[in-house]
């Protein structure tokens, strides 16, 4: 076959045993043979085996032939013709100079509208951007890599670099400098203009294009200097750092005298003395078993004395109630009248048949609120279990709730609780007659709401 007689040394054998050359297209004769076999109805896989050409090469050649009708290599997928012709580049430059903000796709549409290019020769958007970047804007950004341009200048002309031009001074700058500089804030006067700081660009300093600049560069080059501050300038700057932002137990030696005088010691002592004077000591004894402070409204006279009565049980009683003041079972509070003996002013005590009673007068501040002492932990108020409910409790359950010394198996029937009336529980009669609690007049019923009216329908 013709492709086997090709010069050896630059190719090899493919997977089918056919010879090929790297980087070279398939010979024209083989291409024509592939097309002829395809017209005869031979499948591409059979063509590949007969001609020993890879299946990909056969498919590519046949596909290109069906699309374009050509079997020549490089027609599809090859190098495109050059679209960046001098005429197109010149037009793109004209459009960009007329409208510098013109986009590449606008330039492409204008090239097609004016007939400069057709659909096959018009450059792409990326090509137009590359042309603008490399060929249109290049004359405006010529780098100054050499100083050859000085030879074309006449002796009377001087090319001054842009960095040598002094920028206009700010209207806020004065003899003290800019108001935003450190010297301007601190009020430090700057030296004369002959001693001002000069910053020269190292790249353009090597290319001095004038005789005056070359003569000035012969002198020693000035370096950047740092501003030095005196002691009178450093002290105001260090004051904010010496101030203590957090309270400390011990005074720091770095505090200034002005800061030490902010809170003098006599002022603190006088404040402590005033605070101590407002605290009044209380000698009121506290009752036992008062674990929590319970507060109720005041219903009694705040200055009426109270008596603590200890009752001695009868000898015939089967209860094992202790008869000491520390007992919490039979310790009661009774209001004692202001005149006469205590026994005559308390009628409920006459119902008792005890041999002796012990009374103690207490007029402390802790008993001012009357009902403040009444609570579940008040001595003299044991846990009361109603008679109707005693049947549902076992003896062991009741014994677990009440201490053995304060529990009796019999039904609890204490005479004072039966004889105490509502007048004792509410000494202030205004509470009983208050229309808030007991109103003799019938209150008008509220008008039925929408939901209630709907229920009655």
UniProtKB/Swiss-Prot annotation:
DNA-binding region per Swiss-Prot/TrEMBL record: 9-135
Transmembrane parts of this sequence: none
Coiled-coil stretches: none
Keyword annotations from UniProtKB, A to Z: Developmental protein, Differentiation, DNA-binding, Nucleus, Paired box, Phosphoprotein, Transcription, Transcription regulation
One GO term (biological process): DNA-templated transcription
Chief location bin: nucleus
Renumbered residue ranges of the record's region PAI subdomain: 12-68
Gene Ontology MF terms: DNA binding; DNA-binding transcription activator activity, RNA polymerase II-specific; DNA-binding transcription factor activity; DNA-binding transcription factor activity, RNA polymerase II-specific; RNA polymerase II cis-regulatory region sequence-specific DNA binding; sequence-specific DNA binding; sequence-specific double-stranded DNA binding; transcription cis-regulatory region binding
Residues covered by region (RED subdomain): 87-135
Modified residues (Phosphoserine): 304
Biased composition (Polar residues): 159-182
Annotated CDD domains: PAX
Pfam families: PAX, Pax2_C
Subcellular location: Nucleus
GO CC, any one term: nucleus
InterPro entries the record matches: Homeodomain-like_sf, PAIRED_DNA-bd_dom, Paired_dom, Pax2_C, PAX_fam, WH-like_DNA-bd_sf
Highest taxon, organism lineage: Eukaryota
Region called Disordered, residue ranges: 159-226
Keyword set includes Signal: no
Assembly information from the UniProt record: Interacts with WWTR1.
Reported function: Thought to encode a transcription factor. It may have a role in kidney cell differentiation. May play a regulatory role in mammalian development.
Annotated protein name in UniProt: Paired box protein Pax-8
Lineage, top ranks: Eukaryota, Metazoa, Chordata, Craniata, Vertebrata
Gene that encodes it: Pax8
